[in-house]
Regions:
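Short, charge-rich amphipathic segments
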Residues: 1-6, 49-67
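N-terminal leader/targeting and pre-domain segments
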Residues: 3-37, 134-137, 141, 146
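Short, charged low-complexity linear segments at domain edges
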Residues: 17-33, 57-76
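A generic structural signal for short, non-catalytic loop/turn and secondary-structure boundary residues
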Residues: 37-39, 76, 93, 110
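Local cysteine-cluster metal-coordination motifs and their immediate loop/turn environment
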Residues: 41-57, 82-103
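Feature captures the catalytic cores and cofactor-binding loops of soluble hydro-lyases/lyases
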Residues: 78-80
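Short flanking/linker segments adjacent to small metal-binding domains or redox-active Cys/His motifs
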Residues: 94-158
Length: 158
């Protein structure tokens, strides 16, 4: 989770400088609709729906991965990796599934954009660190030992 900072009178502020609602770590008290989101190089979406989420046996996988990113200094800056839980991707048979989205408008690595990873519930902390480091260094995931969800060719549906 985005780390909230304790500043005077027990008020919390998130990394973007917004005061946080009591009981939350990043939800702003006042929504500023025109405020941009915090930069990220890579965004990883992790399926947290019934089947994939059940495979994790860890309800806090997204929060735990955010903590790992903080430990290895990839939670902010130019190489920031953002983690989000999602609903079903429709790829339950490959559980547990994650999708990598690279911010190709700025400094994302196109070769790693839209890669679907499978069986992520089997990843150790070290495996996650290997993935995060490769993404930050723009190493192709195709060249590493990360099992991917196979995609059919578009011609399959003609």
């Amino acid at each position: 989770m985005m780390e909230a900072k304790n500043i005077m009178e027990n008020r919390l502020f998130n990394m973007m400088g917004s005061e946080v609602v009591s009981g939350f770590s990043c939800k702003p008290v006042k929504l500023v609709p025109d405020k941009p989101i915090m930069h990220f190089k890579t965004h990883i979406f992790i399926c947290g729906d019934e089947r994939c989420g059940g495979a994790h046996k860890n309800e806090n996988i997204a929060a735990d991965l955010r903590d790992v990113l903080k430990e290895i200094n990839l939670a902010n800056g130019e190489t920031r990796i953002k983690i989000s839980r999602t609903g079903c991707f429709g790829a339950c048979r490959f559980r547990s599934v994650a999708n990598i989205y690279e911010n190709t408008k700025t400094n994302g690595f196109e070769a790693n954009n839209n890669i679907w990873l499978r069986n992520i519930h089997k990843y150790t902390k070290e495996k996650w660190i290997e993935l995060f480091t490769a993404l930050a260094q723009n190493k192709s995931i195709d060249d590493l030992d990360f099992k991917q969800v196979p995609m059919s060719e578009p011609s399959t549906y003609k």
